Amino acid sequence: MLTEIHPKLPMRSKVLTRNYYINKLGFHEFGNIDHPGYLMLKKDHIQIHFFEFKTLDPKENYGQIYIRTEHIDELYQQCLDNGVDIHPNGPLQIKPWGQKEFALLDPDHNLITFGQTVS
């Protein structure tokens, strides 16, 4: 039986990634040990793990995740209020497949898309 999934994304700088996800997106760090080259963050029921990839070229990074959420309008506004740059092709909108979505690129150009089912 599958119970959870925790995506692992590349990061060039643990400090930069930590600060972005905590200060801009409202995540918090968890775990009792600071693992060299590895970062674990959590918000609500979502965990995202990051592994160090110092030579990553952000323009060549195709890391991406899709996060289902509730109250997407409020989440979108919080991102705007926190100065998060929304992806140019990813402003909040209803998609033909029945999801209300928005997307952003983190400092390493991992594409993070948030979506909520619309009735």
Predicted regions and their residues:
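Short secondary-structure junctions
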Residues: G26-N32, I86-N89
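Vicinal oxygen chelate
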Residues: R12-K14, I65-L111
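Conserved short beta-strand elements that form part of the metal-binding/catalytic scaffold
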Residues: H28-G63, L111-Q116
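Short, flexible helix/strand-to-coil boundary loops that buttress conserved ligand/catalytic motifs
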Residues: Y21, K54, C79
